[in-house]
Amino acid sequence: MDQTRSLESFLAYVQQRDPHQSEFAQAVREVMTTLWPFLEENPRYRQLSLLERLVEPERVIQFRVTWVDDRNQVQVNRAWRVQFNSAIGPFKGGMRFHPSVNLSILKFLGFEQTFKNALTTLPMGGGKGGSDFDPKGKSEGEVMRFCQALMTELYRHLGPDTDVPAGDIGVGGREVGFMAGMMKKLSNNSACVFTGKGLSFGGSLIRPEATGYGLVYFTEAMLKRHGLGFEGMRVAVSGSGNVAQYAIEKAMQFGARVVTASDSKGTVVDEAGFTAEKLARLCEIKASRDGRLADYAAEFGLTYLEGKQPWGVPVDIALPCATQNELDADAARTLISNGVKAVAEGANMPTTIEATDLFLEAGVLFAPGKAANAGGVATSGLEMAQNAARLGWKAEKVDARLHHIMLDIHHACVEYGGEASQTNYVRGANIAGFVKVADAMIGQGVI
């Protein structure tokens, strides 16, 4: 049976193979829906079972992690590493620690990462990993013991030319350091096998800022192409972690008035807009073990919408930076009715397919995460380059390279998604990333 004779038959094939992996199926549907007209015009990409190979990870590693907590009780977690596609380079993608982590989510993230990494023009394949371990409320000793226990299995599957993980939700510089240290201990090798490391042992300047900065660089390029800009715009940001914090900082530098931030408990609204002082305090509060956005709102006398997302606040630009599927169709309708001009994804797939369709139908500029938030992995690639050369670049050089890469990604999206009146960035990003990966797979034969 030819699964690629139509879009629906191919999506049914994916669903039938993994019927309980809804997040992965959603990611495949989003990509293939925009790709299919291009595939019909270029049938060579449907030969040699290329599409079937593209949606099947090269390797999935699942393992048990046993560790001892502060009460001397043995705890058991599950962990995975999805090595999705290495056609253009070693597997590259973050590690996520969160109770919601499962194989479907990691396959979706690895699939998206494959195209995102291709868009950066750097030689990196796609992968993703993580565990259902929850670092919230854990002591530093517990986090360290978990990371070290995880690496006793994972280390054998990593290497600078094989698989180079990084951080993600629940995995910051501390966790990366613990894992990188244990990797060095077990392998007796100090080669670069993690990015997002501390500056004292091979990290890169601008890496913590890169995803948020890159998001704003891409969004500014998108706005400029359509006669707009951040200057004077009201901006809603969701989330209050790393990506959100640096997106707020860079948007402020571009002249925007950022009026929201959020966490899992609610949203803070600041009609006057963030200032450098307020942002610094937000970062301090969120860095504490039990930091809550409600405390920040109370300190500055701001409105706090408990249990609410930021999408009901009238804004010109929305930057979802929290988690997948946070912006649904109802939220999209509210934003559209309030006159939103642009939406750019700082998180991975934070916008549902229905919401994305509504934005595109309404003529709202929409930047998908695989393009807009590629700055983090792009700077990870720059960190790998610095490690390989045994060099460290100045912050200005890394930032300039990041800005250049984001403009290149924007150019690729326009090349494949350009239209007379408005660029379809979803189509452009999907086709541009697909073509690079597919050409590499075809060139390497059936393997």
Give the positions of each predicted feature.
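N-terminal ligand-binding/catalytic initiation module
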Residues: 1-205, 439-445
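Predominant activation on well-ordered alpha-helical scaffold segments within soluble catalytic domains
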Residues: 11-12, 29, 33, 103, ...
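Active-site nucleophile and cofactor-binding loops and adjacent substrate-binding regions
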Residues: 72, 168-169, 204-211, 236-240, ...
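General beta-strand structural signal in soluble alpha/beta enzymes
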Residues: 162-166, 190-194, 237, 260-263, ...
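Glycine-rich phosphate/diphosphate-binding loop of Rossmann-like nucleotide-binding domains
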Residues: 198, 203-312
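Rossmann-like adenosine-cofactor binding region
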Residues: 266-366, 371
